Amino acid sequence: MIELCLLGATGSIGSQVLDLIREKRDVYRLAAFSFGHNINKALDIIEEFEPDLVCAIEELDAKRIKETFPKVEVTFGNKGLQQVATHNCLCPKVINALVGSVGLTPTLSAIEVGRDVYLANKETLVIGGELVMAKAKENNVKIIPIDSEHSAIFQLLNGNDINEVKRIIITASGGSFRDKTRDELEHVTKEDALNHPNWNMGSKITIDSATMMNKGFELIEAHYLFDLPMEKISYIMHKESIIHSLVEFYDGSVFAQMATSDMRLPIKYALEYPSHSYTEMVEPLDLVKVGCLHFNELSLDRFPMLEYAIEAINKGNIYPTILNAANEVAVGLFLEDRIKFLDIEKIVKEALDNPIYEKFTTGELTIPKIMSVDELVRIQILTKYR
């Protein structure tokens, strides 16, 4: 029996992990999980899966759970996330499906106790990729990607020599506004942005997909996950989201990973790596039904957030933290109807260009530095826009 420690059980990825557990109850058990603010869904999960440990973000929610399920160990807050990541159980696998920079610390906690991490939390590598991969190597643990694009690359590289790779190509659906002009973006709404053409995802990542910051994050993730220089990482628009990534080798061969747009497939592959065992959860790919696949260039003029992400990783050090914190706050403000869609780009660019952060750009990158800058960026933006 494999016992899962699931960070972010009530979100989009977490819910799909639970689908996998339901399909294979003889293989997996949910030993511990965390959740954000969906207390009712968390209570349902406890009722169904009977975990040992539950972490709430809010103390009041933790108290309610303890009153309802007195035999369950309950914790809360950031320290609670670390407890979930290090929970003592049989054959543990830690799945990080959190959203935002809050995912970094529990990832490091899991690594430090020698646990492989199954990673859906993009921000872990965006802001702390250098530290995370170094710690993983030091502790001889694996970071297995759950993101569909990185899962595809992970599969395509398996059994191949990384030194023979000319480049990897990450595909992008283009998001909710891929067919709109810059002028048309002036008038789009939150509801428009949340209507993704291909994927069923959480609200934050759906907005990131619309701005193309999601793809920028994926470039940074790939840089760290596969230890490739940025010049070997490229991108292309592929509206159908059938090809999830490609790998081109120096002999001219190009390998592509294809599947339907269902996150349960990369989740399943990550947890069962390197197996491709049978499942009824995912609809088989029917290429005749798909008919045609289309590819287009991704313009940095049309999608400047992609350029900002490339700028941040090229500058290195604390700049990816600035990028991520500014984006998290800006997306939050947009979802609260406090700013317009194009203001997200404006806020991120202002943060990257703000000279107040220059004093943090020298010296070693550390967790305290990341956390300090993350907090400062958030304060600066919220002071101006709230």
Feature annotation, model-predicted:
Residues M1-R386:
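Catalytic, metal-anchored helix/loop core of enzyme active sites in primary metabolism
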